[in-house]
Amino acid sequence: MSTELVTTQKLLVKLPKNVDKPQEQLDLQYEQSLAALVALKDEQTLPAEIRQHADRLTKWLNRESDSMENMDTSTRLTQIAMVQPTTQHAAKPDNAKPGDLFSTVGDLISRPFKFRVLYGFRTHVRFQQGEKAPVCGSPDGVLGSPLGKCDLCAFAPMGTQKIPGTTTPKPWNDQKPSECANQLTFLVVDSTYSNLYEIQFSKTSIKAGNVLATLAKGSGDKLWNKEFMLETEKQANAKGTYYILKVSPAGNPIDDGHDKVCLALKSFDVAGRQKFLRVFYDSY
């Protein structure tokens, strides 16, 4: 198959940047990034504490697998979730109350949760009213399955809608609420370099995700040189009370010598995501 275009009966789709490589090259890139991450625990140019952090985080990624070869970040990363009054998540701790944070492996997360950003990406997901499963989803905010190109979709998320027949964004006042929602996902490491998580911002918390994206960009390529705090805030409307995520800076930029660890973690996860996107586009 061409590395430039994916042809389906529905449409012609251009592969995204950095995914337009042969699958073999993406596989090799993934294997090399994994090897570089694993090797950090033995890199003598790094202080012992940082080598220990690298080893601990690598094991955290691999905590459910007996072999590093079986690591799959797309299914293995733990998410941080928020308790709403109606939350029925199977991993919610018994002692968790509305407004609390918990991990999808069942741990209660202390608030505020202090973290550093490794990288982030945007996705789209569409739910029809009353349905628990999405009717369409896009892992990159560009191509959705099964409805096709996001920028041509009648259900494009508010803020991304285009003037019909063009690629020109509609004026903000003409943007309408949609069943499809923007989601911002960030790969983060906690401030003690003990755990890796994904934090997803959507719906009423998308504003906090946009704030985090803007603040993190101020660090340039080294997003991890800034620390942030994740909190929740109680809100109310005609339907009752609910909670939203809030993000704020935790202090001045910090360079604590973890550049190699953070870059290796980012590179490994990005390589895994690129592999996943290539498979997604090829199977469309």
Regions found by a protein language model. Name each.
Residues S2-T192, N237:
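OB-fold ssDNA-binding interfaces and closely related basic DNA-contact patches used
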Residues P177-N252:
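Extended serine/threonine-enriched, polar tracts that run as long, contiguous segments within proteins
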Residues R56, S205-T214, G257-L263, K275:
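Exposed alpha-helical structural elements
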Residues Q23-D27, E43-L46, I50, F201, ...:
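Intrinsic-disorder-associated interaction segments
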Residues Q29, L118, T192, L196, ...:
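Intrinsically disordered, low-complexity N-terminal regions enriched in serine/proline/glycine
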Residues D20, A39-D42, N62, D66, ...:
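Generic surface-pattern signal
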Residues H124, A154, N237-Y284:
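Long, highly charged low-complexity segments enriched in Glu/Asp and Lys/Arg with interspersed Ser/Thr
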